[in-house]
């Protein structure tokens, strides 16, 4: 995997990392928590993933990239109170939940 952009804004949404992994264009959300009881992975909420998906579609539309190449990943980093990583998890190819009916 090769990072090609960092902190990309698409409308009001910021994508932490955009990377290429073979034919996939990977949009990565990075979540970090320091010395807290909750885990960084627990903060990957469906609404955030839905916004990331919409941002990825917008990113690809502007660059005429087929949406079939999109992959959504997340990296969750848990730090101890000194800032040392105690857990790093990489979630590949997350399924994006359907938004609730209005």
Segments from the language model and where they lie:
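A short acidic/basic microdomain associated with nuclease active sites
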Residues: 1-11
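Conserved catalytic cores of phosphodiester-cleaving nucleases, focusing on short active-site segments
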Residues: 15-37, 52
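Mg2+/Mn2+-dependent nuclease catalytic core
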Residues: 33-62
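Active-site donor-binding loop signature of nucleotide-sugar glycosyltransferases
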Residues: 8, 30-32, 93
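Structural motif
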Residues: 12, 23-25, 69, 88
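Short secondary-structure boundary/hinge segments and terminal tails
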Residues: 12-14, 78
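Hydrophobic residues on conserved beta-strands that form the core of alpha/beta folds
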Residues: 3-5, 27, 72
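Domain-level recognition of nuclease-like catalytic cores that cleave nucleotide substrates
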Residues: 62-102
